[in-house]
């Protein structure tokens, strides 16, 4: 258990740092204000799959809070929570044991993408906008538009780049029973 907690702490630090750096360097704007294509969610998917839902939550939450603080001066807490929840849900989208054994085929890809799509819909289409209305008194039409666009572009980003990262990772793992004794 202690070894696992050390892995989670290290993964959280590295993952949060990558979340900040990628979010800072690769930020592709959309026509909707304050909404952009964010490639760090693909990395969040990889780390969440490898280290579990808790690490995923911490990486998303801490990474987003730091990114907002560095780029905008203060975190937008409802969306910071959203990133944490995305990491949490993404951690449930992949069977970690299978992935570390090199198994990430069509069945696993479909499962992962169903989970990530539903998570994006719930987090960015409902939780973050409702939080913006309740916490920041933002106009509903504005925040739901931002949430829907963010959810769609994040779902697409994770479907393409996140799936690719997971597939590439699985390809580096040796499947059990594939080594022969000579």
Curated annotation (Swiss-Prot):
**Predominant cellular place of this UniProt entry's protein:** membrane
Note the coiled coil stretches, chain numbering.
Answer: none
Give the highest taxon in the source lineage. Answer: Bacteria
**Record field: transmembrane:** 8-28, 42-62, 74-94, 114-134, 146-166
Membrane found in the keyword field: yes
Which locations, inside or outside the cell, does it occupy? Answer: Cell membrane
One of the record's GO cellular component terms: plasma membrane
- InterPro entries assigned: ECF_substrate-spec-like, UPF0397
Keywords annotated in UniProt: Cell membrane, Membrane, Transmembrane, Transmembrane helix
How does this chain sit within the bilayer? Multi-pass membrane protein
Describe the family membership recorded for this protein in Swiss-Prot or TrEMBL: Belongs to the UPF0397 family.
What HAMAP family does the database record attribute to this sequence?
UPF0397
The protein here is known as UPF0397 protein LLNZ_01795
Q: Which organism is this entry from?
A: Lactococcus lactis subsp. cremoris (strain NZ9000)
């Amino acid at each position: 258990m202690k070894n696992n907690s050390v892995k989670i702490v290290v993964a959280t630090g590295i993952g949060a740092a990558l979340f900040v750096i990628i979010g800072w360097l690769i930020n592709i704007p959309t026509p909707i204000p304050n909404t952009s294509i964010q490639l760090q969610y693909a990395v969040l998917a990889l780390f969440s799959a490898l280290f579990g839902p808790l690490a995923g939550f911490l990486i998303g939450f801490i990474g987003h809070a730091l990114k907002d603080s560095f780029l905008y001066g203060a975190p937008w807490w409802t969306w910071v929570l959203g990133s944490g929840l995305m990491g949490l849900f993404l951690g449930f989208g992949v069977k970690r044991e299978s992935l570390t054994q090199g198994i990430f085929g069509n069945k696993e890809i479909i499962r992962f993408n169903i989970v990530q799509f539903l998570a994006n819909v719930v987090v960015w289409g409902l939780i973050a906008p409702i939080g913006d209305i309740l916490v920041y008194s933002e106009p509903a039409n504005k925040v739901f538009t931002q949430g829907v666009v963010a959810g769609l572009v994040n779902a697409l980003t994770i479907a393409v780049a996140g799936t690719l990262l997971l597939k590439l990772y699985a390809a580096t793992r040796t499947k059990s029973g594939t080594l022969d004794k000579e």
